[in-house]
């Protein structure tokens, strides 16, 4: 009985730690800009390949993607990275 309680507590703690560090917007595709003369909005994005924040843009007509941050500080705060 006591072993079951310890296993349950360990699993609960593991799930809590995993959920706390999860930032879904950081897992979205990075911003890669627009083609031609389309209206673009510039900002910051988290690049999973490099593991850091970089400048990027998105086409305004498609709406704001989830992996968009107004500043480098906002990006680093949400996703970490260099």
From Swiss-Prot:
Keyword list, A-Z: Cell adhesion impairing toxin, Cytoplasmic vesicle, Disulfide bond, Hemostasis impairing toxin, Platelet aggregation inhibiting toxin, Secreted, Signal, Toxin
Leader sequence segment: 1-21
Motif (Cell attachment site): 35-37
GO molecular function: serine-type endopeptidase inhibitor activity; toxin activity
SS bond partners: 26-79, 34-59, 53-75
Subcellular localization(s) per the UniProt record: Cytoplasmic vesicle, Secretory vesicle; Secreted
Chief location category: cytoplasm
Any one Gene Ontology cellular component term annotated for this protein: extracellular region
Tissue expression pattern: Expressed in salivary glands.
InterPro entries cross-referenced by the UniProt entry: Kunitz_BPTI_sf (IPR036880)
Protein task: Tick salivary platelet aggregation inhibitor that plays an important part in the anti-hemostatic strategy of ticks. Inhibits platelet aggregation induced by ADP (IC(50)=130 nM), collagen, the thrombin receptor-activating peptide, and epinephrine, although platelets are activated and their shape changed. Binding to platelets is similar for resting and activated platelets (Kd=50-70 nM). Acts by specifically binding to platelet membrane glycoprotein IIb-IIIa (ITGA2B/ITGB3) in a divalent metal ion dependent manner.
Name under which the protein is recorded: Savignygrin (-)
């Amino acid at each position: 009985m006591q072993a079951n309680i310890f296993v349950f507590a360990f699993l609960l703690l593991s799930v809590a730690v995993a959920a706390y560090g999860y930032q879904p917007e950081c897992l979205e595709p990075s911003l890669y800009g627009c083609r031609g003369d389309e209206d673009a909005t510039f900002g910051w994005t988290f690049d999973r390949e490099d593991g850091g924040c970089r400048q990027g843009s998105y086409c305004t007509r498609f709406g704001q993607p989830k992996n968009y941050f107004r500043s480098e500080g906002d990006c680093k705060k949400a996703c970490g990275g260099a």
